[in-house]
């Protein structure tokens, strides 16, 4: 079962999306702050991160930057911030997608599946190359 870290501080959004993700077969951990997100990320292995931009103690950009220092885990920004500068910043920092709220739930689920599918394909290709002594 694939595991998602959902970083969001709005309780009304957390419950609905977490329920939907779990009903779709994902395990979901939620963090409401940058500090909590980074602690969970260091402690657990995740297949995908969903990040809000605005958090009580910083930004999703802070989480993305810290994660990108040590990991290639897929990251999707899921936020109300639709300013072009935020979108460009998120993608330039290494996010795989940037989705603005309000979003269509089925579209989000399809994007998550597509990103996880690509991530798994790259992981398998990497393992195959390492197994054959090619790197």
Which residues does each PLM region occupy?
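N-terminal/domain-start alpha-helical segments
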Residues: 1-120
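CheY-like receiver
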Residues: 119-135
């Amino acid at each position: 079962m694939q595991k998602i870290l959902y970083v969001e501080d709005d309780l009304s959004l957390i419950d609905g999306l977490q329920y939907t993700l779990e009903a779709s077969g994902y395990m979901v951990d939620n963090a409401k702050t940058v500090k909590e997100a980074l602690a969970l990320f260091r402690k657990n292995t995740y297949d995908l991160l969903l990040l809000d931009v605005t958090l009580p103690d910083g930004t999703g950009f802070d989480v993305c930057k810290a994660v990108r220092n040590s990991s290639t885990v897929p990251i999707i920004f899921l936020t109300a911030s639709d300013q072009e500068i935020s979108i460009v910043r998120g993608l330039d920092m290494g996010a795989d997608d940037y989705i603005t709220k309000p979003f269509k739930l089925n579209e989000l689920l399809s994007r998550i599946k597509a990103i996880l599918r690509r991530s798994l394909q790259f992981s398998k290709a990497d393992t195959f190359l390492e197994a054959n002594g090619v790197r």
